[in-house]
Regions:
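Alpha-helical substrate-binding/gating segment
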Residues: 168, 194-203
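Glycine/proline-rich active-site loop of Rossmann-fold NAD(P)-dependent oxidoreductases
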Residues: 157, 182-198
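N-terminal Rossmann-like NAD(P)+-binding domain of SDR-like oxidoreductases, especially those catalyzing
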Residues: 1-184
């Protein structure tokens, strides 16, 4: 049986690390990408004991040539999980252009690379509950209207619909999963919930 190969963008994050661990247990070859400024920030992978089991590649989602290089190098990729983003809402207000270039157009660049190099690749886009913005409904689902309230949320809406468009227009297996806040021991200490729990531990 052929060993499957998966690319995970944003491998150094909470979700990237747990997903890598899960796929490795299923005997996948895992290629993890991260931006140059995150190089060496692999403490989550070390904590899970998988740091040396992953093929690492630097890849800036703002650069077409870097994305194309990865797809040219790894010709037998089966799945791509796009978890990378400029994911801080406050930062997105300070740097809306950079946020859009990475979070919105980065998704488009990956999907275009899949269209150009290998349309058999299955693509997963990590969408965000931030797309809903301020809503009146108690619960949200796929039919809840989007009301993005930040450059980050707007970028995620763009990525969400771009994924849908590539699925319908180019017959690519491209899906989105809408993620709400979720916690774990690998959650970054810069997030509010982690600050609260760390503060409670010190009491």
């Amino acid at each position: 049986m052929k060993k499957k190969t998966a690319i995970i963008t944003g491998i150094s994050g909470q979700d990237g690390a747990y997903l890598a661990e899960f796929l490795l247990k299923k005997n996948y070859k895992v290629i993890g990408t991260d931006r140059r400024s995150s190089r060496g920030n692999f403490w989550r992978l070390r904590r899970l004991g998988i740091e040396n089991k992953i093929n690492y590649e630097e890849m800036e989602l703002s650069e077409n040539c870097e994305i194309d290089r990865i797809f040219k190098k790894y010709k037998n990729v089966d799945e791509v999980y796009n978890l990378a983003a400029q994911s801080f809402v406050a930062t997105s207000f300070r740097s809306p252009v950079n946020t859009s270039n990475i979070t919105a157009l980065g998704t488009l660049r990956i999907l275009e690379a899949i269209r150009n190099f290998n349309t058999n690749i299955k693509f997963y886009q990590a969408s965000s509950s931030e797309m809903f913005g301020e809503v009146l409904e108690k619960f949200q689902n796929e039919k809840t209207p989007f009301n993005p309230r930040s450059p980050y949320a707007i970028s995620k809406v763009f990525s969400h619909f771009t994924t849908k468009n590539y699925r319908e227009a180019y017959n690519i297996f491209a899906v989105s999963g809408i993620l709400f806040n979720h916690e774990s021991p690998l959650r970054g200490e810069e997030f509010v919930t982690r600050k609260i729990t760390l503060g409670l531990v010190k009491i």
